[in-house]
């Protein structure tokens, strides 16, 4: 018996679900070159426009000159350098928590935290729309795994009644495909009432949300008691790469001892930590970035509603336009690209069947004029698609 990979690939093509990697031939930013074509992009997660910031680039360059290029070893051997330590202290300060721990990727942070905290005989409860890394972590933990209805504290409470052992409730802060936010106060109340812990992956909230860019937990004014485990990524609003878990002294020490994705991997380049420290400095000093981004979000939503587009409930930089049919979403993405604008079509299995969408993401690096160009192109494309015979 052999693996029939060709048949699997053919089936995916037939369902309009086949994915290909665009080749980026320029730095990240609103104006990019993809597969040789200049495009105005609305599909990256560089929410504050820091990925190509000259000061961040210089911090990386000078960090490489001082500390070299590679991490060289795992953190527990000889890979934990002074820049790593300084970044962990800065992230602890940003989150208002005693400690923070660096991970190489967001996927590894989620996998490491969940599997270190729960196992056989325990329970992990997750929002049904959580990121794949969180769902995988729950499944791989060995704990009893169950999902509650999306953003539904009542559904969570019913499942908490049946939980056994140490119980970890896990949710995204901002849901990456819908752009809506978790009702953290309600989830925290339900979780705390049953003596469970709440873990929040705020990958898309850090930077854009909160009074100081501290994310959704800061937005709601929640502390360590309500959210004992807080995860963030550095490759989105901070414009670099990596991730972290923030929490109590005991939590971080436990992760150092028991989180296998932390223990058994080489540390990130020290120069990368230098660059991220500069990003954090810019987050504190350049408040206009968050203010400008908020204005662009308002501009886009008002314009999209005037066109009659079906938006989702989001006040974040993630602004999905619900299309429904996968082939139609791909067609709209292609039509936009023909007009020099890049917006990704998101299809199953990333989103539920029948809910394909265009996923617009906005950045502080965009201008009001660029957002208006996007709105005009969307109006033209939707009007043109409706006039085509197959969609009339």
From Swiss-Prot:
<dbReference type="InterPro" id="IPR001917">
    <property type="entry name" value="Aminotrans_II_pyridoxalP_BS"/>
</dbReference>
<comment type="pathway">
    <text>Cofactor biosynthesis; biotin biosynthesis.</text>
</comment>
<feature type="binding site">
    <location>
        <begin position="106"/>
        <end position="107"/>
    </location>
    <ligand>
        <name>pyridoxal 5'-phosphate</name>
    </ligand>
</feature>
<dbReference type="GO" id="GO:0030170">
    <property type="term" value="F:pyridoxal phosphate binding"/>
</dbReference>
<comment type="function">
    <text>Catalyzes the decarboxylative condensation of pimeloyl-[acyl-carrier protein] and L-alanine to produce 8-amino-7-oxononanoate (AON), [acyl-carrier protein], and carbon dioxide.</text>
</comment>
<dbReference type="InterPro" id="IPR050087">
    <property type="entry name" value="AON_synthase_class-II"/>
</dbReference>
<protein>
    <recommendedName>
        <fullName>8-amino-7-oxononanoate synthase</fullName>
        <ecNumber>2.3.1.47</ecNumber>
    </recommendedName>
</protein>
<feature type="binding site">
    <location>
        <position position="233"/>
    </location>
    <ligand>
        <name>pyridoxal 5'-phosphate</name>
    </ligand>
</feature>
<feature type="binding site">
    <location>
        <position position="350"/>
    </location>
    <ligand>
        <name>substrate</name>
    </ligand>
</feature>
<dbReference type="InterPro" id="IPR004723">
    <property type="entry name" value="AONS_Archaea/Proteobacteria"/>
</dbReference>
<dbReference type="GO" id="GO:0009102">
    <property type="term" value="P:biotin biosynthetic process"/>
</dbReference>
<feature type="binding site">
    <location>
        <position position="131"/>
    </location>
    <ligand>
        <name>substrate</name>
    </ligand>
</feature>
<dbReference type="InterPro" id="IPR015424">
    <property type="entry name" value="PyrdxlP-dep_Trfase"/>
</dbReference>
<keyword id="KW-0093">Biotin biosynthesis</keyword>
<feature type="modified residue" description="N6-(pyridoxal phosphate)lysine">
    <location>
        <position position="236"/>
    </location>
</feature>
<dbReference type="InterPro" id="IPR022834">
    <property type="entry name" value="AONS_Proteobacteria"/>
</dbReference>
<dbReference type="InterPro" id="IPR015421">
    <property type="entry name" value="PyrdxlP-dep_Trfase_major"/>
</dbReference>
<keyword id="KW-0808">Transferase</keyword>
<dbReference type="GO" id="GO:0008710">
    <property type="term" value="F:8-amino-7-oxononanoate synthase activity"/>
</dbReference>
<dbReference type="Pfam" id="PF00155">
    <property type="entry name" value="Aminotran_1_2"/>
</dbReference>
<dbReference type="InterPro" id="IPR015422">
    <property type="entry name" value="PyrdxlP-dep_Trfase_small"/>
</dbReference>
<keyword id="KW-0663">Pyridoxal phosphate</keyword>
<comment type="subunit">
    <text>Homodimer.</text>
</comment>
<feature type="binding site">
    <location>
        <position position="176"/>
    </location>
    <ligand>
        <name>pyridoxal 5'-phosphate</name>
    </ligand>
</feature>
<dbReference type="InterPro" id="IPR004839">
    <property type="entry name" value="Aminotransferase_I/II_large"/>
</dbReference>
<feature type="binding site">
    <location>
        <position position="19"/>
    </location>
    <ligand>
        <name>substrate</name>
    </ligand>
</feature>
<feature type="binding site">
    <location>
        <position position="204"/>
    </location>
    <ligand>
        <name>pyridoxal 5'-phosphate</name>
    </ligand>
</feature>
<comment type="similarity">
    <text>Belongs to the class-II pyridoxal-phosphate-dependent aminotransferase family. BioF subfamily.</text>
</comment>
